[in-house]
């Protein structure tokens, strides 16, 4: 399973990049879903695994089963996967693509802890800086902690940016102890 994910990742990332740049995330999602549904069928899996079936014949079968659900870009992807004997990792490609799509479309949740209450102008500026840095929409949840002395601590996902006076003092204390 881990090997299939490793093999599928570059394909999923390339398709996602193409879909994002062309503004066709939804279309690609449908295309990958259609191909994935076909590849999951036991009879199709047997054909894919059969060394006596030529890549040309396999391509014809997949294209005919998909019908109009497969546009030219989708056909090129299927052809590439067949030529590289990677069509069996389509479920993982589809899964990874959907994960990338979900990440792209979602809004980042930022936990902002400030030493003092932020006015709306300060919060808007902070959010716009975060949106530029992460290139995604950011929703900030703000709280106040006077122990920070000054500055802010921001947590987005597993990343923490601590520009508070308290954080800087702790970093200096740690450096001096080392």
From Swiss-Prot:
- Alphabetized UniProt keyword annotations: ATP synthesis, Cell inner membrane, Cell membrane, CF(1), Hydrogen ion transport, Ion transport, Membrane, Transport
Q: How does it assemble?
A: F-type ATPases have 2 components, F(1) - the catalytic core - and F(0) - the membrane proton channel. F(1) has five subunits: alpha(3), beta(3), gamma(1), delta(1), epsilon(1). F(0) has three main subunits: a(1), b(2) and c(10-14). The alpha and beta chains form an alternating ring which encloses part of the gamma chain. F(1) is attached to F(0) by a central stalk formed by the gamma and epsilon chains, while a peripheral stalk is formed by the delta and b chains.
Q: Where does the record place it? A: Cell inner membrane
The uppermost taxa in this organism's lineage are: Bacteria, Pseudomonadati, Pseudomonadota, Betaproteobacteria, Nitrosomonadales
Species per Swiss-Prot/TrEMBL record: Nitrosomonas europaea (strain ATCC 19718 / CIP 103999 / KCTC 2705 / NBRC 14298)
Q: Which GO terms describe its cellular component?
A: plasma membrane; proton-transporting ATP synthase complex
Identify one Pfam family in the record.
Answer: OSCP
Query: What's the family?
Result: Belongs to the ATPase delta chain family.
Q: What does this protein do?
A: F(1)F(0) ATP synthase produces ATP from ADP in the presence of a proton or sodium gradient. F-type ATPases consist of two structural domains, F(1) containing the extramembraneous catalytic core and F(0) containing the membrane proton channel, linked together by a central stalk and a peripheral stalk. During catalysis, ATP synthesis in the catalytic domain of F(1) is coupled via a rotary mechanism of the central stalk subunits to proton translocation.
Could you confirm whether the keyword Nucleotidyltransferase appears in this record?
no
Alphabetical list of SUPFAM superfamilies matching this protein: N-terminal domain of the delta subunit of the F1F0-ATP synthase (SSF47928)
- UniProt key word Ion transport: yes
According to UniProt, the name of this protein is: ATP synthase subunit delta
Topology versus the membrane: Peripheral membrane protein
What Gene Ontology terms describe what this protein does at the molecular function level? proton-transporting ATP synthase activity, rotational mechanism
Q: Which NCBIfam families match?
A: ATP_synt_delta, PRK05758.2-2
